[in-house]
Amino acid sequence: MQEYCYQIRKLKMLKVAILDDYQNVAQQFVDLKKLSGKYEFKIFSEPFLDEADAIEQLADFEALLIMRERTPITKNLIDNLNDLKFVITSGLRNKSVDLEAAKKRKIIVCGTDINVNPTPELTWALILGLARNFKEEIDNMYQGYWQTTIGVELKGKILGLIGLGRVGTEVAKIGKAFGMQVMAWSENLSLDKCKELDVLPCSKDDLITNSDVLSIHVQGGNRYKDCITLKELDKMKKTAF
């Protein structure tokens, strides 16, 4: 009887697919062995050949753990995964999930809390790399040269931000620490937030024409799809990043 109950429990284990873990990081953050009594995990480290391949390989899974927008969870994919009950994404939002199709199938879609620090840190790594010519200097160093360019001092320069949400706020704080003047624009810019951060609210055109460094921190999608085009780039300072 005990053996029979054990077999029943095994049959009821939730089958979970972890998609697009091509950096092999999933097991660094979660000890999957501790969860093996309740869940049967399979990690997909390689991208699918196409959607038909994804449907074939994911047919038996009840839950998909997806990393960002690497594999689109389309209506066609959802409609063809008959056992699918859950879609869990890293981060709060995922533009690649067809939420309407999931809702019709009564599939639960949810996300995780976010760590706001990595994106501002990477943003500032890129800004500093541009201002101090990291790429060119590193390439020249490998050729035997040393200090071949002169960098740009950031203190006193204007940092322009499109978007002043969680990420934009942290980028602004670091900009102020460098002694930069920070300006911001977005369609739903909070004047109270600007006052709190000592950020100058402005029009989009003023932001484009005055910024020495322009950094964009808004959600993807149609709302800001054509936010920066060749027209805007032509208005920027020739020395701007």
Language-model-detected regions and their locations in the chain:
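Structural motif corresponding to alpha-helix initiation and N-cap regions
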Residues: 29, 48-52, 70-75, 96, ...
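Phosphate-coordination loops involved in phosphoryl transfer and adenosine-cofactor binding
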Residues: 13, 84, 155-158, 230, ...
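Glycine-rich NAD(P)-binding loop of Rossmann-like domains
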Residues: 137-170, 179
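Rossmann-like adenosine-cofactor binding region
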Residues: 56-60, 72-75, 188-241
